[in-house]
Amino acid sequence: MEQNIQLDAIDRRILRALQSDGRMTYDVLAAQVSLSPSATLRRVKRLEEDKVIAGYVALIPPERVGLGLTAYLNVRLEKHSEVHKRNPMDLFRAAVLTWPEVVECAALTGEMDYLLRVVVEDMAHYSRFIMDTLLKHPSVQDCKTSFVLDRVKNTTAVPV
């Protein structure tokens, strides 16, 4: 389990501000959190070193780059029965890392083993991914799909 980093109120204000605009200058950030720019810089560097801030990215709406269909796939894997066979979970995890359509993969408790978030151009692209990639993988036993009709809430910010 990861070590829990102690954050004070100023750290939390810095994190909230950077989650809303990761490109703001240290001067602007310092003004927002009521610190000097040098003190703000020190805190941000510490948060980066402690991996509280894991990185900075550009957020790209999939629809703006031709990926208009989002699906959530519940995937069930076969249960391995032979001792010499490689674990189906290991095989599946390695494969998922190579599939560009999969933008998120979570291991689950319950009836299904994994939940995938997949972004594709359209239903034809989805069908190719399912038929030619996912269902042909030797560890996949079953999958069930739900398509996104509307995103009611979509944020990358965590409540700090």
Model-derived features with residue positions:
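A compositional/biophysical signature of low hydrophobicity enriched in polar/charged and small residues
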Residues: M1-V160
